C-alpha cells in the first residue's frame, strides 16, 4: 500500500506524471487474494490529510476483504458461465420431427444463485415410439447440471435400446444411486406410439402432467408413481397406459412452473391446467408462451423451469 498526504507529495514521488495538485490525499491499495493480485483500490480525499498508523492498518485490512470478495465474485462468474454452458450443451438443440406429432420444449433459468439448475427435457425418437422426458435434479450449479447431463444420457441410452418405460426409470434410478448417493431427481417418462396414439407413462416423484383433449376438456393426469430417483434402488415404478387422440396435447413441466410461496403444488398444477384450457387449441408455441408468461415476467424466479 502507498499513502500520500497530498497530491504534491505524490508529484514529488513520481515527477513528470500529470497530476491535479488541487485535490487532496490518496491511498493506493493493492488487492491481493491467495498471493495473487486481483485488482487495485484507490481512495481519494478532497483535501490533504495524514494517515495515522491505525488508519493505514484499517485501510490495508479493508483492501484484503475487498480482494477476497472480488476473488469470490470472479470465481462465481466463472462457475456460473461454466454451468450455463454445460446446461446449454446438454439441452436438445432441436427436437425430432415425427409425422403426426408436434413437439416443443422451453427452458427458463432461475434468477437466484447460479441461475442454473438440474431441469431438463428431451424428446427421443426410438424408431417405433417417441419418448417424451422431463426431469429435475435437486439443487443448482455445476454439480446439478453435471448430474442432469448424466441422467439425460442414461435415459437416452435406455430408450434407444428399446427398454420398457419402467425399465428406463428403474435403470436411471440405480445409476443415480451409484453416481451420487444422497442426490435425488424427479422424472416423468412417456413412451408414445405416434401411429396408434397409445402412450405408456411412468412417474418418479414428478409433478402430474396435464392433458388437453381434442374437445377442449383439460385434466390433470393422476398417474400413479414411485418415489424420486436416487433414494431406493429397489423402488418400483408403475406404468400407466392411455391413448392420446388426434388433436390432444400433453404438457410435461418441472416444479419451477407451479411453485409459489404460500401455495401447494396441487394449486400450481391446477393453475397450469386452467391456463391451457382457457387458451384452447392454439399453436404449441403460443401455448408455451402463455403457460410460461407469468414466470418469464417475474423478476424473482427462485427455480428454473422446463416445459
Ranges and model annotations:
Residues 60-67:
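Allosteric cytosolic regulatory segments
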Residues 55-58:
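Alpha-helical transmembrane segments within multi-pass membrane transporters and channels
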Residues 29-45, 254:
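Sensory-domain boundary capping and coupling elements
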Residues 24-33, 240:
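A short, aliphatic-rich beta-strand micro-motif
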Residues 169, 243-252, 257-307:
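C-terminal catalytic subdomain
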Residues 17-23, 182:
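Short loop/turn motifs at secondary-structure junctions and domain boundaries
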Amino acid at each position: 500500500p502507498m499513502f500520500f498526504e497530498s497530491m504534491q507529495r505524490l508529484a514529488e514521488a513520481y515527477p513528470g506524471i500529470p497530476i491535479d495538485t488541487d485535490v487532496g490525499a490518496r491511498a493506493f491499495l493493492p488487492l491481493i487474494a491467495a498471493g495473487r493480485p486481483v485488482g487495485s483500490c484507490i481512495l481519494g480525499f478532497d483535501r490533504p490529510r495524514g494517515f495515522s498508523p491505525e488508519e493505514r492498518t484499517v485501510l490495508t485490512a479493508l483492501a484484503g476483504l475487498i480482494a477476497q470478495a472480488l476473488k469470490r465474485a470472479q470465481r462465481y462468474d466463472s462457475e456460473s458461465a461454466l454451468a450455463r454452458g454445460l446446461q446449454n450443451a446438454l439441452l436438445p438443440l432441436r427436437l425430432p420431427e415425427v409425422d403426426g406429432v408436434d413437439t416443443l420444449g422451453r427452458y427458463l433459468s432461475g434468477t437466484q444463485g447460479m441461475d442454473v439448475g438440474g431441469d431438463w427435457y428431451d424428446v427421443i425418437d426410438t424408431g417405433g415410439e417417441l419418448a417424451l422426458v422431463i426431469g429435475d435434479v435437486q439443487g443448482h450449479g455445476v454439480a446439478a447440471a453435471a448430474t442432469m447431463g448424466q441422467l439425460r444420457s442414461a435415459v437416452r441410452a435406455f430408450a434407444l435400446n428399446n427398454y420398457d418405460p419402467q425399465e428406463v426409470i428403474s435403470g436411471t434410478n440405480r445409476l443415480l444411486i451409484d453416481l451420487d448417493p444422497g442426490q435425488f431427481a424427479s422424472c416423468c417418462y412417456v413412451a408414445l406410439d405416434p401411429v396408434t396414439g397409445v402412450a405408456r407413462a411412468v412417474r418418479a416423484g414428478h409433478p402430474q402432467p396435464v392433458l388437453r383433449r381434442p374437445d377442449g376438456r383439460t385434466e390433470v393426469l393422476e398417474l400413479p408413481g414411485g418415489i424420486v430417483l436416487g433414494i431406493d434402488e429397489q423402488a418400483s415404478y408403475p406404468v400407466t397406459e392411455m391413448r392420446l387422440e388426434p388433436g390432444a396435447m400433453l404438457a410435461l413441466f418441472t416444479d419451477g412452473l407451479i411453485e409459489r410461496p404460500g401455495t401447494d403444488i396441487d394449486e400450481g398444477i391446477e393453475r397450469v391446467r386452467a391456463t391451457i384450457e382457457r387458451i384452447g387449441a392454439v399453436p404449441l408455441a403460443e401455448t408455451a408462451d402463455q403457460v410460461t408468461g407469468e414466470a418469464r415476467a417475474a423478476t424473482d424466479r427462485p427455480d428454473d423451469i422446463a416445459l
